[in-house]
Amino acid sequence: MTTTVEQVVTALEQRYPVELASDWDAVGLVCGDPAASVQHVLFAVDPVLSVVDEALAVGADMIVAHHPLFLHGVHSVAPITPKGRVVHTLISHGIALYLSLIHI
């Protein structure tokens, strides 16, 4: 049986309800197809490019990170910016990103 991004998210949110997060916490699925298959999940503190590179190196299909990628309004995710590079790399390699600031 294949595990999906949606199933991983559901399991996380059943164990660590989103309602426990503060109002300002940026939690949830940032990118990734909920129907995509997940075989390996990488847990990290920060969703930075070095973590994405590690996910690629170990064959992770999903990253669960503690700190948010975007905490305030975003005006660009152009790949010339650090956060934009993260987003573009995740999407181009089909890696899902789930954020859970306080509640995990």
Sequence positions of predicted segments:
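N-terminal glycine-rich anion-binding loop in soluble enzyme alpha/beta folds
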Residues: M1-Q39
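Alpha-helical scaffold segments in soluble metabolic enzymes
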Residues: Q7, A11, E54, T89
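Short HxH-centered metal-ligating active-site micro-motif
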Residues: V45-I80, H93-A96
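Catalytic-core regions built around general acid/base machinery
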Residues: P82-L90
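Polyanion-binding loop/helix "lid" in catalytic or ligand-binding cores
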Residues: Y98-S100
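Conserved small/polar residues in nucleotide/adenosyl-binding loops
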Residues: I102-I104
